[in-house]
């Protein structure tokens, strides 16, 4: 019995965790490059990527299609489009979503473990 034959115990949450993890990396890159002249901030539209993945698109392609450049409210003179406060806020919100998704998955694992042990 291969992995593809096993029932999906986590539903869309496994995919959501992957997407949130990738988004965390993109946002961290934006924050790290806040002082880099000409750097263009990007973000992953989490909702669009999740919908695409739910519709059968593989996660990597869903991320590629949902990755967009940010349009700054206040463009800088050096061409950098990172707005640090917005990036930090998006990072924090994404981290909360990541933690909540991970907690749900942990709960599922605990439930399955208890069921297998007969608790």
Predicted regions and their residues:
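Amphipathic alpha-helical polymerization modules
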Residues: 1-119
């Amino acid at each position: 019995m291969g992995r593809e034959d096993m029932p999906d115990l986590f539903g869309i949450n496994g995919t959501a965790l992957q997407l949130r993890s990738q988004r965390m990396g993109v946002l961290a890159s934006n924050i790290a490059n806040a002082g880099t002249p000409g750097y263009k901030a990007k973000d992953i539209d989490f909702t669009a990527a999740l919908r695409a993945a739910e519709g059968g698109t593989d996660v990597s392609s869903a991320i590629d299609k949902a990755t967009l450049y940010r349009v700054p409210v206040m463009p800088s003179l050096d061409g950098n489009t990172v707005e640090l406060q917005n990036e930090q806020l998006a990072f924090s919100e994404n981290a909360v979503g990541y933690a909540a998704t991970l907690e749900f998955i942990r709960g599922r694992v605990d439930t399955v473990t208890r069921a297998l042990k007969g608790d």
